[in-house]
Amino acid sequence: MMAATTLTMTAQTQADDVLNVARKVNNFFMAKYSDPTLPTNVNKVRPSSLWTRAVYYEGLMALNDIDPQLRYVDYTDRWATFHHWTPRNGINTCDADDQCCVQTYLIRYRENHDEAILVRAAANLGHQMQTPNDQKNATAKTKGTQPSLYGWWTWIDAIQMAMPVYMQMYKLTGDEKYRDHAMKMYRWSRNECGGGLFNTKDGLWWRDADYVPPYKEPDGRDCY
């Protein structure tokens, strides 16, 4: 009994330590970027709805799940409202870098039930589901790949940034078209893009279509 109690107390102490570190890191971030509407400026000025900032809000919402604080929600809503709860570069973007922010919008939708959020997300995904990455629509990331209706995720980060948006929409609406299309896009990235971004032999993903064989690092190894 004493051993079990000690283990429980140790586990709780470790959990508290982790939470305290997360709070400190987030407090630093929110103090440094006190105005969430300001653009980012890392070698280039970009809107704060860019993926590099969007992934922070994913983490903030996860922190809010275990450490609920109104200031987390207020900070997030200021950011999202400034960007009109819309993907970076608008409804007609097919770039996962632009869509990443929608993950947080949909998390907030579960709480505020603002139907406009769902409408914008549905419009964006609806556009993508009808738009192939052909010459007319190609971006810098998709040029050089075989045109496909499912061929927008040519780098593996995109799977993390955009696939959850599809699955969130499936869960929120019950419409299987979001789940099914996302899985087709995932399989295209895994099995077809550049000959397939997943190396079944090593069990690792090549970073993007530019790094599949015959590309090698200077030491002759594959680049993951």
Residue ranges and their predicted role:
Residues Q12-Y224:
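Glycan-recognition and catalytic cores of secretory/periplasmic carbohydrate-active enzymes
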Residues M1-T13:
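Bacterial Sec-dependent N-terminal signal peptides
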